Each structure stands twice: as structure tokens, then as C-alpha cells.
Amino acid sequence: MIPGEILTDDGEHELNAGRATRSLVVANTGDRPVQVGSHYHFFEVNDALSFDRAAARGFRLNIAAGTAVRFEPGQTRTVELVELAGDRAVYGFQGKVMGPL
């Protein structure tokens, strides 16, 4: 076994099963690429990304842990978000929440 290794059964595994999801259209209005990691509170991403921020409060990208989505300048794409789990409290990032959702 390798430290941090996760051993799973064979077959496919559904990520975030049973959790609420929503899709949002996101546009990078800036002149630089913006990359957002898998566990970043999407409500607080770079202000150059234009989307319905209120709808993103309490959600993150619905992608595998340790991965990211990159938004090129001028690019518009639809992303799927998944609700945050656990205590549903957000601290850090841009400091826009700093407590329970």
C-alpha cells in the first residue's frame, strides 16, 4: 500500500451520489485564463468569471478531487456544480462567507 492510496472495488464509481447539483453558464470576461480547483467554493471564484453567483453559493465544481477547470479569456461554458457537504460552513477563499451557509 502507498501512503494516501485508496483501494476500491472494480467497476465504475459515482462521485457525489445523492447530492444536489445545478448547471451554470460561466463566461471569463477577463484577459487572463482562470483555473478553478475541485473544492473551491464557486460563489467566491475570480471576479472575472461572470455567472449567477447567488445560485453558486454553497456549491463547488462537480469534478474529481484534485482536478480543475480552466476558463480561457472570452470563453463561455456550462459547468455542473455540486452542493458542499459536511458542516456546510465556508472559511477563507475570498472571505465572502466566513461561517455557516
Swiss-Prot record:
Keywords: Cytoplasm, Hydrolase
Enzyme class, first EC level, given as a word: hydrolase
EC number(s) reported in the record: 3.5.1.5
Catalysed conversion reaction: urea + 2 H2O + H(+) = hydrogencarbonate + 2 NH4(+)
Localization terms from the record: Cytoplasm
Gene3D superfamilies in the cross-refs: Urease, beta subunit (2.10.150.10)
Pathways per UniProt: Nitrogen metabolism; urea degradation; CO(2) and NH(3) from urea (urease route): step 1/1
GO terms of molecular function: urease activity
GO biological process: urea catabolic process
Keyword Hydrolase belongs to the record: yes
A Gene Ontology term for the protein's cellular component: urease complex
Quaternary structure and partners: Heterotrimer of UreA (gamma), UreB (beta) and UreC (alpha) subunits. Three heterotrimers associate to form the active enzyme.
The protein, known as: Urease subunit beta
Source organism (scientific name): Burkholderia vietnamiensis (strain G4 / LMG 22486)
Gene: ureB
